[in-house]
Amino acid sequence: MSDIKVRFAPSPTGFMHIGNTRTALFNWLLAKKLGGKFMLRIDDTDKLRSKKEYEDAMRESLKWLGFEWGEEARQSARFERYDELRDKLIAEGRIYACYDSPEELEIKRKRAMAKGQAPIYDRQALKYTADDLAKFKAEGRKPHYRFKLVDEVIEWDDIVRGHCKYEASKLSDPIIIREDGSYLYHFPSCVDDSDFGITHIVRGEDHVTNTAAQIQMFKAIGGKVPTFAHLPLLTGTEGKLSKRLGSLGVRELKAEGVEPMAICSFLAKLGTSDAIEPYYTLDELAESLDFEKLGRSQPKFDEEELKRFNTKFVRSMPYELVANRIPVSKEFWEKVKPNLDVVEDIRVWNNICNDVVVPVMEDRELTEIAASVLPPEPWDDTTFNAWLNEVKAKSGKKGKELFHPIRKALTALENGPELKTLLPLIGYEKTLMRLKGIKA
């Protein structure tokens, strides 16, 4: 086991979606490839929006995807630690109170924009007089708190983006504590990453500017700065950030029959120079992980493409991966899987071919003709069409009048798998009996 340690830190304010699934996946694969540890951290500082049902659903989704973890923490249990370091940094002048109202901040932002300037906080709060503070108190204002950035060039080597450089003077001091005393993302995340020994942080590129500020936070609290990897964000098929990507849930995909390893294979290779091909274990997928193959452009995620890939995935799945899920033999699975879209479809085939079917007799005259000309086995790919043509010639029926009564007799279903493929799997004896209206 190496010293490498990563974390997946979801906020339980909604269900697992494609975006954070991809983040969890890359973290897990990195830990697995480097022989490190994967930690789950519940970022539940938002007391109003955090819900246990979301947290439980996230755990369920992570386990279904195959991600394992040996350590976990939750931020709501660590407020004393955050407060301890907050007080230390206030005393050192690195965290300071601000009484600007949202309206006042918006006015400042618009003024800066009108002048063609970046809307950087002007640090007016550092110039408060005793009279100012007395006035704010009399008005009942409560402060929010900012982290004071040191004027320097902040640099790091990003696994995905390469060398990154930001001038702290061109960044606003980030707000880290709200007026109600609750913490925003930045500060608790740094404290946790430092305390739990996180060595690598893999997350979306929307956090890049956060990283610049957080590097200074790590140093301010005496922590070691981790290695960062910022993944390009997924877009919809139209090339824009899509609300659908934030709502398309793992639970929804699971309900639609999308396989967990199909999701992982697809997301791991989307936007890379590798072809999107089926991987049947996370270990195998982890071995193929190479951040250098990850492009800088934002990959387009297409839900329908994922489902098509899932069909390809299912049709090449080894029997060993489904043996404990479906009540069929290996021989039957291998014969039928080229016709499946999702694994659960096998149950329809199994019911028709291996279970007892009560025929629905829609046209006895037709099915009696069909029974009378049913050829003996062995059957090959030409048998069905030759047999059907003979039934057609003898009955004078065609189209739906020909197909439908035979389907209902053989399967008792209105619709279903192709009869041409089904017939050899049902076999001569059962086919003959069902055509005669006998339960078989």
Roles of regions detected by a PLM:
Residues 27, 58, 89, 93, ...:
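Residue-level signal for inorganic ion chemistry
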Residues 97, 101-230, 235-241, 249-252, ...:
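Active-site cores that bind ATP or allylic diphosphates and position pyrophosphate for catalysis
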Residues 10-16, 201, 390-396:
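A short glycine/serine-rich beta->alpha loop
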Residues 1-117, 210-223:
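N-terminal Rossmann-like or analogous alpha/beta NTP/dinucleotide-binding catalytic cores
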Residues 2-7, 250, 283-290, 323-325, ...:
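Short amphipathic alpha-helical segments and their helix-coil junctions
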Residues 209, 221-359, 411-440:
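Catalytic adenosine-cofactor/nucleotide-binding cores of aminoacyl-tRNA synthetases and other
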Residues 8-12, 42-44, 191, 195, ...:
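Short, histidine-centered active-site or binding-site loop motifs used for metal coordination
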Residues 362-410, 414:
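C-terminal accessory/binding modules appended to enzymatic or scaffolding proteins
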